[in-house]
Amino acid sequence: MLPMITLFGCSESAKHSVREYPETRKDLTVVDNYFGTEVADPYRWLENDTTAETAQWVEAQRAVTEDYLSQIPFREDIKKRMTELVNYERYSLPSKRFNRYLYSKNDGLQNQNVIYIQNSLDEEPSVLLDPNTLSDDGTVALSGTSQSNDGKYLAYTIQRSGSDWVEIYVMDIATRQLLPDHIEWAKFTGASWYKDGFFYG
């Protein structure tokens, strides 16, 4: 229902204004030859996301999009209602290793779930890993966790700025200290423990 309302609101707003979209440069010099067939790729320059021109293009697109969406008259009402719907405590199922229980919890509006640990079901839980503190700007995401078979270590993977590449860290659960083991440039993988090590891809 909400997507239909949103689209209707956008359409109504669009009727009252003529929007000027930013121009996108076409580079007609970029042509690939595949076995005798020439294929033009005039927008390949946009694949280089580190240039000033690409950054300016993205900013122009963001500005025109925000201007369009800001004219939805009930946009704030939708935001308020959606916030109300997701603002509740959420828990994962706990996992147990050698009388330690690990689970994740979200208080409601946290960007990422926090990993908690308990040494017994009667003990007050404590924070083992809070991914919301991994970066100041929220661009580092926790993508997976894996507890060692002896319950001593937690391997976890993070992604930076939405990248498919992941980094693997290993934490000593008792001390909360990171081990020197730090693996970079892994992809689409977690850590699968075997004895005192783990496999990854």
Language model features with spans:
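Beta-propeller folds
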Residues: M4-G201
